[in-house]
Amino acid sequence: MKKTIIVAVAALALAHVASAQTNLQMFYDFGRGYATTTLEGFYADNWGDTFFFIDHYYATKADRENTGAGTAINGSYFEIERNLNFWKDSPLADLSLHVEYDGATWGAGVACVGVNYFMHSDDFKNIYNVAVMYDHHIGYGSASVPVKFTGVWGMQDIFGVEGLRFSGFIDIWGLDSQFANPDDILHPYETNLTILSEPQIWYNVGKHIGVENLNVGGEVELSLNFAGNHGFMCNPCIGTKWVF
């Protein structure tokens, strides 16, 4: 999952610098041992903004042979979100209505509705986005507590280094899950909460060679009860990002 472009271009839009951005990220996941790509885009207009991303996972031959067809292996996950804001000239300009759909090739689907709040520093270099939503599971999965919280951040030129960016997101949502208990196969672990965070760091190395589209860096996926894994997991990734 990637949401880091949201606050980056939202700040630019408010600063009247740009209203759209599309980028492609390519990662190697050291924890899982395969590559992923992420295509994401943000587009602002007079009625709010639209954001989407598509993650695709490139499994190895061994992964495919040992994993069922209905899983994320060699599959895709996507989110599309819309913030609706018809009051940009009012004191509530930073508060928007939020609708979202999350889906995957392995059957997962969630529709969300809620509110979104945008915050920024005076120079727009440090930006934050918070959304609280009611989520409804479609087809696959259920939630005793059907609530989702999303926080997104972006910090530009950190440590005074031009072109160095720290960004990321955290998702916390209700999801009823069962995990195998190796000590008691008749009583699996049961959880009702999932957490996923992906802090990223990028450096605009391309500015040194006349290609400012190119960034290098990576991310760390931190999760709790996520993607079939009970408990805490940490998956570091190295990657590149091309901004169109």
Segments predicted by a language model, with ranges:
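Transmembrane beta-barrel domains of Gram-negative outer membranes and organellar outer membranes
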Residues: 23-29, 33-90, 94-100
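Outer-membrane beta-barrel "beta-signal"
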Residues: 232-244
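Solvent-exposed loop/turn segments connecting transmembrane beta-strands
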Residues: 29-35, 60-74, 101-111, 136-145, ...
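Membrane-embedded beta-strands of outer-membrane beta-barrel proteins
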Residues: 39, 80, 113-115, 149-153, ...
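Transmembrane beta-strands of outer-membrane beta-barrel pores
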Residues: 26-32, 45, 56-60, 99-105, ...
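Short loop/turn motifs that connect adjacent beta-strands in outer-membrane beta-barrel proteins
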Residues: 20-21, 47-49, 85-96, 120-129, ...
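Outer-membrane beta-barrel transmembrane domain signature
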Residues: 135-215, 221-225, 242-244
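Cleavable N-terminal export/targeting peptides
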Residues: 1-21
